[in-house]
């Protein structure tokens, strides 16, 4: 059971990744971003998730450097994720995109690098690039994002190395049970983006009722639900009190009955694009 903020999941290659991290989607470059990353690290977060398309890797890198200094830790204590964008999928293109991300972040290796979306006809060559970088020790773990079962099956017909992570949209309205079961059977660790459904679930009466029982916020209930399902979670926030509150989910446990009540909210409802039908 996940008992503290720095508890880690062990990926199928033996690399350990924190169960809990900070997401920075839709946070623009600037002092707010730098402070959010630094604040999270100072408050004990050890995992930061960004992506090339977010356009904020430089600020994330600055926040990492400031956070390391203020928290008195080393780079090796952190787990940093970025993702290659669709326009850069391809063997040489992906290798080049990785160098660009690394340079913007100001790092000499990444802990996790993901293919952001399953662009048909492109992701196998991109995966080959990730395998190369992994074998060279430039990345500690490699994975995918927004891949459905059929994408994973197709990728693995050509892959030498199985993805360690599949990061997908996951929240009480989109529980992706079949995909989770498939990934668990394959030894692919699931990770949730947009775990709070971009704030749309924070007024939900069932969740509010459960939150009252535990004297916790709705956000804390949802994030705890992620962890009890064995899913890594990376909620986004730039506000210090929220960064602290989101991470305060290790001093209680949801009953099986409450887990079931939350599971029952599923409507297969997405806030993000459908991985089988996107055009970017």
From Swiss-Prot:
InterPro entries for the chain: AKR, AKR5G, Aldo/ket_reductase_CS, NADP_OxRdtase_dom, NADP_OxRdtase_dom_sf
This enzyme's EC code(s): 1.-.-.-
EC supergroup of this enzyme: oxidoreductase
Key word NADP present: yes
Entry binding sites for substrate: 116
Residues of the active site: 54 (proton donor)
Site feature Lowers pKa of active site Tyr, where: 83
Alphabetically ordered keywords of this record: NADP, Oxidoreductase
Record family assignment: Belongs to the aldo/keto reductase family.
Protein name: Uncharacterized oxidoreductase YtbE
Organism from which the protein derives: Bacillus subtilis (strain 168)
Higher taxonomy: Bacteria, Bacillati, Bacillota, Bacilli, Bacillales
């Amino acid at each position: 059971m996940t008992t503290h903020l720095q508890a880690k999941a062990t990926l199928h290659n033996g690399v350990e990744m924190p169960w809990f991290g900070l997401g920075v989607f839709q946070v623009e470059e600037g002092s707010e971003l730098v402070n959010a990353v630094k604040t999270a690290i100072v408050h004990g977060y050890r995992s930061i998730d960004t992506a090339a398309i977010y356009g904020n890797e430089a600020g994330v890198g600055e926040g990492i450097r400031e956070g390391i200094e203020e928290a008195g830790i080393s780079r090796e204590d952190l787990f940093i994720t970025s993702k290659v964008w669709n326009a850069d999928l391809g063997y040489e293109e992906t290798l080049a995109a990785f160098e660009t991300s690394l340079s913007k972040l100001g790092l000499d290796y990444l802990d996790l690098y993901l293919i952001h979306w399953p662009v048909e006809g492109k992701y196998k060559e991109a995966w080959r690039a990730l395998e190369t970088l992994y074998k060279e020790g430039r990345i500690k773990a490699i994975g995918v994002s927004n891949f459905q079962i059929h994408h994973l099956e197709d990728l693995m017909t050509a892959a030498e190395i199985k993805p360690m992570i599949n990061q997908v949209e996951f929240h009480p309205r989109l529980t992706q049970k079949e995909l989770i079961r498939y990934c668990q059977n394959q030894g692919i660790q699931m990770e949730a983006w947009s775990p709070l459904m971009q704030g749309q679930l924070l007024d939900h009466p069932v969740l509010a009722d459960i939150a009252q029982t535990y004297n916790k916020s709705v956000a804390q209930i949802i994030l705890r639900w992620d962890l009890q399902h064995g899913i890594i979670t990376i909620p986004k926030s730039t506000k210090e009190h929220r960064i602290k509150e989101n991470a305060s989910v290790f001093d209680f446990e949801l009953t099986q009955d409450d887990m079931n009540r939350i599971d029952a909210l599923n409507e297969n409802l997405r806030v993000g694009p459908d991985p089988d039908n996107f055009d970017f």
